């Protein structure tokens, strides 16, 4: 643990150049985006049919049709313009034909949304649907359902697209969308290409930012903010807090985030900034390098620390997936860290001692903590990898 201080201090020297991890190059020229192309003119009836089948057995084909439609908007010249825009951002672009042969008598899980489509609103609503589907790259089914039920209405209404609240929140439907929109898939790259195109257009940028661009920040940005706030609240040196959290991997995450922020800060052109952020999201190393389970656990601890100074902070834990036993343990670790530092950075027990004390306190109060079990059920119960012997 002693080396953690040296490693964290080394973040000051992180530059915009490449690190040892090839997945952190953030270079648009290494990313192949996909655009679906078609010579057909899509009627309202065809688009309604495709929308209704998103989340059903023909999800991939339906999303392909919708991607081709919003890319061209029934004008082949629009597809050429979209390709040029992305190439100018230094991405490689593959234009692939779309398979628009939808079968008959199929399930229609999003028929309610399809019913409200008109000639006037179908482009905007299809974009909104695709932007929402893009969140499945980062959200699991339970978190996506929570998003649709609690946040989508506010965002959709703010953009004049209140019809988006008709998107099905069935777990089975969302699971099929999630299976289609996975990292590295052509559909995923096509949707992210559409996001970029809309971010670059002043007429659509605000809507794209509101409905989907928040995912460009990624979990790392949130982690850095939580960590900084907890460090300030405790009056604890960052290196000491890292040691107490027993999370060496957070240093690697911090290095990647610091590097990304340095690169983005050095670029003046907004188009180039978005290209760098998107290359991070689509790079092969992104989903391999992030310890999502550990991030969830450390987020749980940090929020419990900040709750001691700003009541209501732990309300953000509703979407954080950790096991109920770990929630209890995180509360005790946070309490002991507050006691250790007492706002002035004073010395106290080491990391292993803190964890042992927290485990003991958590066991002693086991009968008083049914509320943690209830919270765990609300956000999906045990988190990924949340076995009892893997609390930390």
Swiss-Prot record:
- InterPro entries reported in the protein's UniProt record: Rhabdo_ncap_2 (IPR004902)
Pfam families from the UniProt entry: Rhabdo_ncap_2
Q: Where in the cell is it found?
A: Virion; Host cytoplasm
Q: Where is the composition biased (Acidic residues)?
A: 365-392
Asked whether the keyword Cell division is assigned, the reply is no
| GO cellular component term of the entry, any | helical viral capsid
Highest taxon listed in the record's lineage = Viruses
Could you tell me which residues belong to the region Disordered? 345-392
Keyword list, A-Z: Capsid protein, Helical capsid protein, Host cytoplasm, Phosphoprotein, Ribonucleoprotein, RNA-binding, Viral nucleoprotein, Virion
Q: Which family does it belong to?
A: Belongs to the novirhabdovirus nucleocapsid protein family.
- The name of this protein is Nucleoprotein
Organism per entry:
Hirame rhabdovirus (strain Korea/CA 9703/1997)
Lineage, highest ranks first: Viruses, Riboviria, Orthornavirae, Negarnaviricota, Haploviricotina
């Amino acid at each position: 643990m002693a080396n953690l201080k040296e490693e964290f201090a080394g973040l000051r020297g992180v530059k915009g150049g490449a690190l040892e991890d090839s997945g952190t190059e953030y270079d648009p020229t290494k990313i192949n985006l996909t655009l679906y192309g078609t010579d057909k003119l899509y009627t309202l009836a065809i688009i309604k049919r495709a929308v209704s089948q998103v989340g059903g057995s023909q999800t991939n084909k339906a999303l392909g049709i919708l991607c081709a439609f919003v890319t061209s908007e029934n004008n082949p010249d629009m597809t050429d313009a979209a390709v040029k825009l992305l190439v100018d951002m230094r991405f490689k672009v593959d234009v692939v034909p779309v398979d628009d042969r939808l079968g008959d008598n199929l399930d229609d899980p999003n028929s309610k949304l399809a019913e409200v489509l008109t000639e006037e609103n179908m482009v905007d609503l299809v974009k909104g649907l695709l932007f929402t589907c893009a969140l499945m790259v980062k959200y699991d089914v339970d978190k996506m359902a929570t998003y649709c039920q609690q946040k989508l209405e506010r965002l959709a209404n703010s953009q004049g697209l209140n019809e988006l609240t008709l998107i099905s929140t069935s777990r089975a439907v969302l699971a099929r969308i999630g299976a289609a929109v996975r990292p590295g898939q052509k559909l995923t790259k096509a949707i992210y290409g559409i996001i970029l195109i809309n971010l670059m257009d002043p007429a659509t940028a605000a809507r794209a930012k509101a409905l989907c661009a928040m995912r460009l920040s990624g979990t790392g940005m949130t982690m850095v903010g939580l960590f900084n706030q907890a460090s300030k609240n405790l009056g604890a040196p960052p290196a000491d807090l890292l040691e107490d959290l027993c999370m060496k991997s957070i240093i690697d995450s911090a290095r990647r985030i610091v590097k990304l922020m340095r690169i983005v800060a050095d670029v003046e052109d907004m188009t180039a900034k978005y290209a760098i952020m998107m290359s991070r999201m689509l790079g092969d190393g992104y989903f391999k390098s992030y310890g999502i389970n550990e991030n969830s656990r450390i987020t749980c601890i940090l929020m419990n620390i900040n709750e001691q100074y700003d009541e209501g902070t732990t309300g953000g834990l509703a979407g954080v997936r950790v096991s109920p036993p770990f929630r209890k343990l995180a509360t005790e670790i946070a309490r002991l860290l507050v006691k250790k530092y007492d706002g002035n950075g004073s010395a106290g027990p080491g990391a292993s001692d803190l964890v042992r004390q927290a485990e003991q306190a958590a066991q002693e109060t086991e009968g008083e903590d049914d509320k943690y079990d209830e919270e765990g059920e609300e956000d999906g119960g045990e988190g990924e990898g949340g076995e009892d012997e893997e609390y930390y």
